[in-house]
From Swiss-Prot:
Biological process annotations from GO: hyperosmotic salinity response; methylation; ubiquinone biosynthetic process
Keywords: Cytoplasm, Methyltransferase, S-adenosyl-L-methionine, Transferase, Ubiquinone biosynthesis
Protein name: Ubiquinone biosynthesis O-methyltransferase
A GO molecular-function descriptor: 2-methoxy-6-polyprenyl-1,4-benzoquinol methyltransferase activity
InterPro entries in alphabetical order: SAM-dependent_MTases_sf, UbiG_MeTrfase
Principal subcellular localisation of the protein: cytoplasm
Keyword Transferase: yes
Pathway info: Cofactor biosynthesis; ubiquinone biosynthesis
Subunit annotation: Homodimer. Component of the Ubi complex metabolon, which regroups five ubiquinone biosynthesis proteins (UbiE, UbiF, UbiG, UbiH and UbiI) and two accessory factors (UbiK and the lipid-binding protein UbiJ).
Protein species of origin: Escherichia coli (strain K12)
One term under GO cellular component: cytoplasmic side of plasma membrane
Reaction(s) this enzyme catalyzes, per UniProt: a 3-demethylubiquinol + S-adenosyl-L-methionine = a ubiquinol + S-adenosyl-L-homocysteine + H(+); a 3-(all-trans-polyprenyl)benzene-1,2-diol + S-adenosyl-L-methionine = a 2-methoxy-6-(all-trans-polyprenyl)phenol + S-adenosyl-L-homocysteine + H(+)
Length: 240
């Protein structure tokens, strides 16, 4: 279980990094700022495992892993997991939590572009969850993810659609009314329409396999996957 440091690449928004550095110590607080991530993680994990045909014995890269919620859960499924993030504090939290949990995950402080330059074609599965909307050049991340996966391997993206409903739900609702996440977590201008993401995917060796929405019901306080990608959505692609 390593936590390596790396030079900063151009595709980093230091203000975004600072946001997550400031709350890193509470990453594994099930009732804290990251409660929504803990709540949706079983849905994400189930979707990834099902679409990828299981994770046991596979080499997996989690891009933008933060404090390691998804990375740890994939390791528990029997995957060999590497977690990438540019936030030093979140990686320290992830490393300590994995140690306490007896879970083996390699954590590296490095951009996905830097990692792709050294590890092209080495992963069976690459995940990039809620990360694209936090970098200056999300298309560059998509290209790097495509370079990192083996032929026939699976790449998963999740992000937020850019429209009025998404702004109301993810910013006004989640940040200011329900206070599910800290204020300022999201910038609607950085949200990504599915057509934009699919356009970037089409310029790589990846091919779209499936897309699904992630929906929150404030009345029942529950999340579920289903049709409709107008707010949160996940995309499964495969290397041709």
């Amino acid at each position: 279980m390593n936590a390596e440091k790396s030079p900063v690449n151009h595709n980093v928004d230091h203000e975004e990094i600072a946001k997550f550095e400031a709350v890193a110590s509470r990453w594994w607080d099930l009732e804290g700022e990251f409660k929504p991530l803990h709540r949706i993680n079983p849905l994400r994990l189930g979707y990834i495992a099902e679409r990828a045909g299981g994770l046991f014995g596979k080499k997996v890269l989690d891009v933008g892993c933060g404090g390691g919620i998804l990375a740890e859960s994939m390791a528990r499924e029997g995957a060999t997991v590497t977690g990438l993030d540019m936030g030093f504090e979140p990686l320290q939290v992830a490393k300590l939590h994995a140690l306490e949990s007896g879970i083996q995950v390699d954590y590296v402080q490095e951009t996905v572009e830097e990692h792709a330059a050294k590890h092209a074609g080495q992963y069976d599965v690459v995940t990039c969850m809620e990360m694209l909307e936090h970098v200056p050049d999300p298309q560059s991340v998509v290209r790097a993810c495509a370079q990192l996966v083996k032929p026939g391997g699976d790449v998963f993206f999740s992000t937020l659609n850019r429209n009025g409903k998404s702004w109301l739900m993810a910013v006004v609702g989640a940040e200011y009314i329900l206070r599910m996440v800290p204020k300022g977590t999201h910038d609607v201008k950085k949200f990504i329409k599915p057509a934009e993401l699919l356009g970037w995917v089409d310029q790589t060796s990846l091919k779209e396999r499936h897309i699904t929405g992630l929906h929150y019901n404030p009345i029942t306080n529950t999340f579920k996957l289903g049709p409709g990608v107008d707010v949160n959505y996940m995309l499964h692609t495969q290397n041709k």
